[in-house]
Amino acid sequence: MRCVTSFVVFCILMFFVLNIFTVEVKAQRLVPLCKTIGYENPGKCPADGNKFCRRKLDDRYVKYKRCDCQDTKGRKQNHHRCICYMKLPCNQ
């Protein structure tokens, strides 16, 4: 019983000690989004893949500097994925 009481008292003291020393943490600035990755679509990239991706992901609020079309293979079928960059260089 003596050990249990000592343990409870120790835990309460540690709780108070840890709450006395508060540390202020500055909020980190959010890194602006640089890259947008589209969904996987069936079929291969067309001949004008970059322009195709730009048309597909283009938005009136966001202007992309560059878009790439990448061919991928999944479940024995061809797919393509569009990746567009809002600013260059995109260091993430």
Swiss-Prot record:
Annotated S-S bridges: 34-90, 45-69, 53-82, 67-84
N-terminal signal peptide: 1-27
GO BP annotation list: defense response to fungus; killing of cells of another organism; signal transduction
Gene Ontology CC terms, in alphabetical order: extracellular region
Compartments where found: Secreted
Domain of life the protein comes from: Eukaryota
Record carries keyword Disulfide bond: yes
UniProt keyword list: Antimicrobial, Disulfide bond, Fungicide, Plant defense, Secreted, Signal
PANTHER family referenced in this protein's UniProt entry, alphabetically: DEFENSIN-LIKE PROTEIN 241-RELATED, DEFENSIN-LIKE PROTEIN 245-RELATED
Family listed: Belongs to the DEFL family.
Protein name (database record): Putative defensin-like protein 251
Organism, as annotated: Arabidopsis thaliana (Mouse-ear cress)
Lineage, uppermost ranks: Eukaryota, Viridiplantae, Streptophyta, Embryophyta, Tracheophyta
